Regions:
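Short, well-structured N-terminal submotif of metal-dependent ribonuclease cores
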Residues: 1-37, 41, 51-69, 138-140
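Acidic, PIN/NYN-like endoribonuclease modules and their adjacent C-terminal/linker elements
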Residues: 1-2, 106, 110-140
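Acidic active-site catalytic centers that drive phospho-/nucleotidyl reactions
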Residues: 6, 44, 102, 120-123
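A generic structural signal for short hydrophobic patches within well-formed alpha-helices
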Residues: 10, 42-45, 86, 124
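Short, flexible helix/strand-to-coil boundary loops that buttress conserved ligand/catalytic motifs
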Residues: 14, 49, 93, 128, ...
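General small-molecule cofactor/ligand-binding pocket signal
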Residues: 36, 79, 132
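Active-site neighborhoods of divalent-metal-dependent phosphate/nucleic-acid chemistry enzymes
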Residues: 47-55, 61, 65, 72-119
Length: 140
């Protein structure tokens, strides 16, 4: 099984020892080579950093370092939005109203035959994508 990691999951894992135990257990049981990120996740992390920067430059700098580590660690396993993802997004967005980034993540997972790992399962329910919420179960 290969996995597309949503922003809420990679952010949870960043917490280290404060990470939710079920998420930590799931993360420990998967191989790095089976984990993928969307470029949109990197964008969401960047947006968060820029939101923090005006009020806490030190925290923003720490998050910058973490983001650089994530980009380095995932390297070629960062997936962009190409024509196939865009067309799939168009099809699934016609099914019902879905936040754009969530629908693009679902489309990316569908195109690349990945399981979307997210806490926000309701956002992609009924779109045909396989989903895992590791907050609920470390084994499924």
């Amino acid at each position: 099984v290969t996995w597309l990691i949503d922003t809420n999951i990679i952010s949870e894992v960043r917490k280290g020892p404060r990470c939710h135990p079920a998420v930590a257990a799931w993360w420990a049981g998967v191989e790095d080579r089976d984990l993928f990120l969307s470029a949109l996740t990197l964008g969401e992390i960047r947006k968060g950093i820029e939101g923090v920067r005006p009020r806490d430059p030190g925290r923003a700098a720490a998050l910058e370092g973490w983001l650089a580590e994530v980009v380095d660690a995932f390297g070629p396993r960062v997936l962009g939005v190409d024509a196939a993802v865009a067309e799939t997004w168009g099809r699934i967005s016609a099914l019902r109203s879905v936040p754009v980034v969530d629908a693009l993540l679902a489309a990316t997972a569908l195109v690349h035959d990945l399981v979307l790992v997210t806490r926000n399962t309701a956002d992609v329910e009924g779109l045909g994508v396989q989903v895992l919420n590791p907050f609920e179960s470390a084994t499924s």
